[in-house]
Amino acid sequence: MTPTRQSLASPPCSPLVAALFVQADGCYSKLPTVDAWPESRDARRYAGPLPVVAHPPCSRWSRLARFCEVRHGLKVGADGGCFEAALRSVRTYGGVIEHPAFSKAWAHFGLPRPDTKHKGWTAGACGGYSCYIEQGRYGHPVKKATWLYVFGVSKDKLPELRWGHTPDSRGTISKNQDWRGGMDKWRDSTGHRAANATPPEFRDVLLRIASMANA
């Protein structure tokens, strides 16, 4: 019997990792091996069973959060329970949380604080690991200093990342631009969507880490 075009097609892939708190049409949305949870699905309700890559909202935990509280009354940590839910998912199903470096959520939830000068992973009493990494080394237009928290992956399986600082702190922004304003200035001129976007190469690193959880 001659096989039909449908029978020759590749079988559909089942999701291997859940991506929580992501943009609806962002870099995770069309990956067949990823179960994407944008705002419309409310990732706080995620109940497994897949390991996760979590990008919980960061504005209430950033280095400017205290200023915003004083100036605008927006309380530090008042994110509707998003970070707490992300942490619960990571500790229950394994995976990784991505947040801006110096996020106040680390101290609030007792996570191991990375050292910006340490090229490697920092172990915590909880059994997880944190690290400092700059997304500019993975294609982001500015350095985008980042902290990661991983749970459910043994130390010997944690990958070596591109440690260290992005050359001249400018990421891939064109060298003919005098860009010394950093992430905040670039976000103001370009928009939060571009600033918050995860470079595809860095996304793949996070997915690889999550896929090793509880293996």
Which residues make up each language-model segment?
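Class I S-adenosyl-L-methionine
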Residues: M1-A215
